[in-house]
């Protein structure tokens, strides 16, 4: 593995490569929390349709990290609003973010986040939000290093 990853806008030609990265990301999440991250057999097909819709939607965007002609990471973001009772402007929301395992801890994630942050700034957002599993210490640490802080806690329980 040599060379440096370059950040760019994703295109329809990236569909399969980003799909593979998404599958790797979901497997990583499933290992952290197998109860929550159970996928349907058609999950990839459904997600790829979502990817296509994101590329066509002005309120969403997809970035790719590429090294040596290979996709090594991707990020997705969208605009998001709070309920209308709050006096807060719309904010950016990070919907997906992944770097393939061999390229982690080499600065790719930090640079990909920098490109993501710049895209949100260009779109006029003053705040970003995201969700991260409490059972995923690696991702929690990464997002804290990127300047995020917890402001809400989601909880769950079985009805049984």
Q: Locations of the language-model features?
A:
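Conserved N-terminal entry element of GNAT/NAT acetyltransferase domains
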Residues: 1-16
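Glycine-rich phosphate/pyrophosphate-binding loop shared by adenosine-nucleotide-utilizing enzymes
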Residues: 5, 69-74, 92
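Conserved GNAT-fold acetyl-CoA-binding loop/helix
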Residues: 26-50
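A short helix-loop-beta-strand connector motif used in the catalytic cores of GNAT acetyltransferases and
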Residues: 49-63, 93
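Conserved beta-strand in the GNAT
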Residues: 64, 70-79, 98
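A short, internal acetyl-CoA/4′-phosphopantetheine-binding micro-motif in the GNAT/acyltransferase core
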Residues: 81, 94-104
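Conserved acyl-CoA
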Residues: 100, 111-127
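Conserved active-site alpha-helix within GNAT-family acetyltransferase domains
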Residues: 110, 122, 134-152, 157
């Amino acid at each position: 593995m040599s060379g440096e990853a370059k950040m760019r806008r994703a295109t329809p030609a990236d569909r399969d490569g980003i799909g593979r990265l998404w599958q790797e990301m979901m497997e990583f999440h499933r290992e952290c929390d197998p109860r929550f991250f159970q996928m349907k057999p058609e999950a990839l097909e459904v997600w790829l349709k979502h990817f296509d819709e994101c590329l066509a939607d002005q309120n969403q965007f997809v970035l790719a990290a590429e090294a040596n002609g290979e996709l090594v990471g991707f990020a997705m973001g969208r605009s998001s609003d709070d309920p209308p009772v709050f006096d807060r402007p719309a904010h950016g929301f990070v919907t997906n973010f992944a770097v393939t395992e061999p390229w982690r801890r080499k600065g790719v994630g930090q640079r990909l986040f920098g490109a993501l942050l710049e895209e949100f700034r260009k779109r006029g957002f003053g705040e970003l939000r995201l969700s991260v599993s409490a059972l995923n210490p690696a991702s929690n640490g990464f997002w804290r290093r990127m300047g995020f802080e917890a402001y809400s806690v989601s909880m769950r329980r079985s009805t049984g």
